[in-house]
């Protein structure tokens, strides 16, 4: 549906226009919206108009069947014990989910297993960090485990804090504090402060970027090892008690997590191919993405003991200071009387090939059974997984139950819906990636969309959505139909509360929708296969709350009680997320015409091109000297805009009783995302193949637009060979221009 995101006359708008549309244009757009809506309504065929009410009634029945109390019960059941990937406990949970999905009424529910490389602490030789004196005596050791939360003291098989896939090693040396270990932090240390990190052990605080990027940056700097810790400035919200009296991180709490740099490869031993019984496996020395230096996480109580002795240079500015009572000196090494002391790492973790299990449920479509809409989320957790992932798994469970109830009553979706409970997401998205690799040919031909369902909440302030532009209109229209769960918005729509609390910085009158990055199971579907993807959850107020994510992330304190006592006592936010995720899946599976709007892609493509052009114009002399031009990209985007507009007009006029024409145009919409995929992938990241979107090279969690061009421009003023660097910029512009032109071609009327 035409909405304020679209522009009324794409051919007459200057490419480098101001961000905000003028008031007159908004009035004109609104007028055209009304006229278009009325025109479209009155030209509906009698059959189509007659079908609206039954379809709407089924959707209402589906949404009404979703119950907060059921989600609460499912979450409680899923969080009684740990479900670490590769363990018997997680296998048993897979079988439990399989059995219950069958009871709910799905046509089939199967287990799909793979043998992948996982990582575990050594049970007899624990990992820890020590301070040693000049004779090698240990004078301080970090904690070996987290104090258990109340009520969980007798739970066994709680994995102690560790960095998954850290190599074994016992390096010792001077300590250097590197802030968040971002690229810009190392630029500050090495270029401005002239501090050499080579041969040092680094300590960095969690936050801002993916932990694997921190480790990669440390390796590039020549470090012997890196220690990660959660600073209270990032994981302790002001005015809130630490767990169990509040939702803040205690001093002994530690964030677990993998530290791989896979760039979409999946299992490190079988990159690009499923890790089945007959797969060829690389040797460990050849494995993809494994870190080369020891890594270990600690809590901020232990970090205090290390940082309080730091000598050397003072922090360059206040942005390097956390909230511990330490000076945050950079080092290298300790100060004064402690200068002869060193830091030593003791890392003994083991990498092992272990079997993992996905649960795949199928609800067969009645009209287009060969077109798949997928709802997937992972079930493996570092410990109890109260938020990550079981708040998402509980919602998926309830969505499956609601769909199953409709099926038992004789209803079927138009298209097939697949439900997935992924394994080993925490280790590197292994379950989803291996399954997608095994089924890639089928998915490329039949995949309509993938909706991710990891954690349902990371706060309780407002909705957060990341998705392809094809789904913008779908998400906006759906949220206008749903009731907001937010206090002060009684009787108002979810769209209204979302728009007020998180407005788009680019489009007036619309809520913010973010780009897809990575760090979750949509990666292989979107970045490698080009299947339209999205995700939704409830989040915190990112404007006022500067702490990273939620404080107890990946710690032993991420329990059911954390959610039930502090985040969502009535589970109304979980229910809202279930309605959004389930509603999106319902529309994707049942709309006669795919609910994708290609015009939204046209608008964002132009914005992305403008952004990169503006970045490049920070170097006007080099642009001129090396004959770098964005004209081909702007021309391609302009062409895409015109063709997308024409396509949308044809959709409005489409005879929906003509099955051949309907199939043709639906397939054009389905394959549009695929048209942005290039077979060779991005430079040095072959499994990231989407030309428009990719995870940032400097932070896996964040999405970047036109990533090939962006990476070529990054830090270009410091490249050794400017001619080669600007040549790469030109090459990436040409690839982007070709891809956008080619994608536009797929929307042309079929001869």
From Swiss-Prot:
Which Gene3D superfamilies does the annotation name?
3.50.30.30, Transferrin receptor-like, dimerisation domain (1.20.930.40), Zn peptidases (3.40.630.10)
The name this protein carries in UniProt is Glutamate carboxypeptidase 2
Q: What is its main location?
A: membrane
**Its gene?**
FOLH1
Keyword annotations for this protein, in alphabetical order, are: Calcium, Carboxypeptidase, Cell membrane, Dipeptidase, Glycoprotein, Hydrolase, Membrane, Metal-binding, Metalloprotease, Multifunctional enzyme, Phosphoprotein, Protease, Signal-anchor, Transmembrane, Transmembrane helix, Zinc
Q: Where does Zn(2+) 1 bind?
A: 378, 388, 454
Which organism encodes this protein? Sus scrofa (Pig)
Can you cite an annotated GO cellular component? plasma membrane
* Residue ranges, annotated region (NAALADase): 275-588
InterPro entries, per database record: PA_dom_sf, PA_domain, Peptidase_M28, Peptidase_M28B, TFR-like_dimer_dom, TFR-like_dimer_dom_sf
CDD domains on file: M28_PSMA_like, PA_GCPII_like
Question: Which PANTHER family does the protein's record reference?
Answer: GLUTAMATE CARBOXYPEPTIDASE 2, N-ACETYLATED-ALPHA-LINKED ACIDIC DIPEPTIDASE
Which residues take part in binding Zn(2+) 2?
388, 426, 554
Membrane topology per record: Single-pass type II membrane protein
Q: In this UniProt entry, which residues form the Extracellular topological domain(s)?
A: 44-750
Detail which positions bind Ca(2+).
270, 273, 434, 437
**Cofactor binding, note field:** Binds 2 Zn(2+) ions per subunit. Required for NAALADase activity.
Summarize how pH affects activity: Optimum pH is 6.0.
Say yes or no: keyword Lyase present.
no
Reaction catalysed?
Release of an unsubstituted, C-terminal glutamyl residue, typically from Ac-Asp-Glu or folylpoly-gamma-glutamates
Where, per UniProt, does this protein localize?
A: Cell membrane
* Residue spans crossing the bilayer: 20-43
């Amino acid at each position: 549906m035409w909405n304020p995101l679209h522009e009324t006359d794409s051919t007459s708008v200057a490419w480098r226009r101001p961000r905000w549309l003028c008031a007159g244009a908004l009035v004109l757009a609104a007028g055209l919206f009304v006229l278009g809506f009325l025109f479209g309504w009155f030209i509906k065929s009698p059959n189509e108009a007659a079908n609206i009410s039954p379809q709407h009634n089924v959707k209402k029945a589906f949404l009404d069947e979703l119950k907060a109390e059921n989600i609460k019960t499912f979450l409680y059941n899923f969080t009684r014990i740990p479900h670490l990937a590769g363990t018997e406990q997680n296998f048993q949970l897979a079988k439990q989910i399989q059995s219950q999905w069958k009871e709910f009424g799905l046509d089939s529910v199967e287990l799909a297993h793979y043998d992948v490389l996982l990582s575990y602490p050594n049970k007899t030789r624990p990992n820890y960090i020590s301070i040693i004196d000049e004779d090698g005596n240990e004078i301080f050791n970090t904690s070996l485990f987290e104090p258990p939360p109340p009520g969980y003291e007798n739970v066994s098989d709680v994995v102690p804090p560790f960095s998954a896939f850290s190599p074994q090693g016992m390096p010792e040396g001077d300590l250097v504090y590197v802030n968040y270990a971002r690229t810009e932090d190392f630029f500050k240390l090495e270029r401005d402060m002239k501090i050499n990190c080579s041969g040092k052990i680094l300590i960095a605080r969690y936050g801002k970027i993916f932990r694997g990027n921190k480790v990669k940056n440390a390796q590039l700097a020549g470090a012997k090892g890196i220690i990660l810790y959660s600073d209270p400035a990032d994981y302790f919200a002001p005015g809130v008690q630490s767990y169990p009296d509040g939702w803040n991180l205690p001093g002994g709490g530690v964030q677990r997590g993998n530290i791989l740099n896979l760039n979409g490869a999946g299992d490190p031993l079988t990159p690009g191919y499923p890790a089945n019984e007959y797969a060829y496996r690389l040797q460990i020395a050849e494995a993809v993405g494994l870190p080369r230096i020891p890594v270990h996480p600690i809590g901020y109580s232990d970090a205090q003991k290390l940082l309080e002795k730091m000598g050397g240079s003072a922090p360059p500015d206040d942005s390097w200071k956390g909230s511990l009572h330490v000076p945050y000196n950079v080092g290298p090494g300790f100060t004064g009387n402690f200068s002869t002391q060193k830091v030593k790492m003791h890392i003994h973790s083991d990498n092992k090939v272990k079997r993992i299990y996905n649960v795949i449920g199928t609800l067969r479509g009645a009209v287009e059974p060969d077109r798949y809409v997928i709802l997937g989320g992972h079930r493996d957790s570092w410990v109890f997984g109260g938020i990550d992932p079981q708040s998402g798994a509980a919602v998926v469970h309830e969505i499956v139950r609601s769909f199953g109830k409709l099926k038992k009553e004789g209803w079927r979706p138009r298209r097939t819906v697949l439900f997935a409970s992924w394994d080993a997401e925490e280790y590197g998205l292994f379950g989803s990636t291996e399954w997608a690799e095994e089924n890639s040919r089928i998915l490329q031909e039949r995949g309509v969309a993938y909706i991710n369902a990891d954690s349902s909440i990371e706060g309780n302030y407002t909705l957060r959505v990341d998705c392809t532009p094809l789904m913008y209109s779908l998400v906006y229209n759906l949220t206008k139909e749903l009731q907001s769960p937010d206090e002060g918005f009684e009787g108002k729509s979810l769209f209204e509360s979302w728009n007020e609390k998180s407005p788009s910085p680019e489009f007036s009158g619309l809520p913010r929708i973010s780009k897809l990055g990575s760090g979750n199971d949509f990666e292989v579907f979107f970045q490698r296969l080009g299947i339209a993807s999205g995700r939704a959850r409830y989040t915190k107020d990112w404007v006022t709350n500067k702490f990273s994510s939620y404080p107890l992330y990946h710690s032993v304190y991420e329990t059911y009680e954390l959610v039930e006592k502090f985040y969502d006592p009535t589970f109304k936010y979980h229910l809202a997320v279930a309605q959004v995720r389930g509603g999106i899946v319902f529309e994707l599976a049942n709309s006669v015409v795919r609910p994708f709007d290609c015009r939204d892609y046209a608008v964002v493509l132009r914005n992305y091109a403008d952004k990169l052009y503006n970045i490049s114009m920070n170097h006007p002399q080099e642009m001129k000297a090396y004959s770098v031009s964005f004209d081909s990209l702007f021309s391609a985007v302009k062409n895409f805009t015109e063709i997308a507009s024409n396509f949308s007009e044809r959709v409005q006029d489409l005879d929906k009783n003509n099955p051949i024409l309907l199939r043709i145009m639906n397939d054009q919409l389905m394959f549009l995302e695929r048209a942005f995929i290039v077979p060779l992938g991005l430079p040095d990241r072959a499994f990231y193949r989407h030309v428009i979107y990719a995870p940032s090279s400097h932070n896996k969690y964040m999405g970047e637009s036109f990533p090939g061009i962006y990476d070529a421009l990054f830090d270009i003023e410091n490249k050794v060979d400017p001619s080669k660097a600007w040549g790469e910029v030109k090459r990436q512009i040409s690839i982007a221009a070709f891809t956008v032109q080619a994608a536009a071609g797929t929307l042309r009327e079929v001869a």
